[in-house]
C-alpha cells in the first residue's frame, strides 16, 4: 500500500479527460496548455495543504491570488477587462480539475467567475465593467453575489432586502443575505433587492433590481455569522447585513425592477460550473477508489478483481463520462449563443447526483477506511454534497426539465 501522502488525489496521473470523447470536439493545443499548467499548480501548490485547510477552515487567499495571476480568476472575462476570455468548455474543464484536488478552492473559483463577474458582464454598463472587472479578473478583489436570504432559498423572488430610491437618484439599501460565498472576504458585491412592488399582472419576480458596489466605498455594511459547514470548509460562507447603506445611482446594475431575467441567466451560467465541480469531486473519488481497490487485497486477490467491485467501477466511470458529455453540450450551446437553460439543467442535475453517488460508492469500497479522515474520500463526499443544493437544487432542476418535457408533449 502507498503512504498517506501518496494516497491523495493525483491530477498528474489522472486519465486525460481532454479530447478523448469521440462525440466531443477535442481541445486544442492552447486549451491543453492551460490545463497542463493548472494541473502542475494544483499538484505542487494546492494538493499538499488541502486536507489541512479542510480541518482549519483557513481561506487560501495566497492561492487565490496566484490563480488570479494565471488568469483563472477571470477565466471568461474579456481580455479588454483584464480577463483570459476563455470559452465555456475550457472553463468547465478548469473547474473539474480544481475540484479533483480541492473542492473548497473550486467553489471559490467557480462562484467568483460565474456569479459576481457573470452578472456584471450580463447587466453592467461599460462604465461598470471598466470599474469592477479588472480587479475581479486579477483577484485583487474577490466577488460575492447576494441572492439567498433567511426566508427565501429556492423561492428566490421572495426576498425581503429592499432599496429605496432617494430624490437625488441614489439608493438606501437595507436587509440581509445568507449563505453568501466569499461573504466575509469579498471586495465587490452584487446584491439583489426589491425596489418596487410587482406591477399588475406580473409575478413577484417583477420589481427586483441588482446593485454592484465595492465594500470599501460604503458604510453600513457588516458581516454577520460565518457558517460552520459540513464540507467546503475553507471556502468562505457568511451572512451579509445592510443597514442604511447609501449607494449612488450608478450602482444600479441592469434595468430597474427587471433584474430577475438577468438572475436566471447568471444561474444558468453558474450551473455549468457547479455541474463541473460535482463531476470533478466524483472523479476524484472514483480515481481514488480504483487505485485503492487495485492495491487492497482481500480473499487472496486485489479487491478490484472481484466482479462486484469491477462492475461498480465500470458503472461509476460510465456515469461520470456521461455527465461530462452533458456539461460539454451545455457549454458549447452557451458559447454558440443558443438557448441552454434546459441542457444545463440536465447537466447540473445529472453531474451532481452521479458525482455524489461516486463519492458514496468510494466510501463503501474503502469500507471502514473510507469513513476516517486519514483517507480523502470522506472529504470528497462532504464537499460534493453542496453541489446538489447550490445554484438550484435537484428539485429545481427537475422542475425546469419536467416543464420542458410536458410542454413538448402537450404541443
Regions of interest found by a model, annotated:
Residues 161-164:
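A structural signal for short hydrophobic beta-strand segments in well-ordered beta-sheet cores
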Residues 170, 174-222:
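A short core secondary-structure module
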Residues 139-147, 192:
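A short, Trp-centered hydrophobic/proline-enriched beta-strand micro-motif
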Residues 71, 95-99, 193, 213-218, ...:
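Short Ser/Thr-interspersed hydrophobic loop/turn segments at strand-loop and sheet-helix junctions
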Residues 109, 151-154, 179-182, 201-202, ...:
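Short Gly/Pro-enriched turn/cap motifs at secondary-structure boundaries
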Residues 158, 218-248:
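Flexible, small-/acidic-enriched active-site or ligand-binding loops
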Residues 1-101, 108-111, 123-127, 138-139, ...:
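Alpha-helical interface subdomain recognition
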Residues 117-123, 157, 198:
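Flexible, glycine-rich active-site loops centered on histidine and acidic residues
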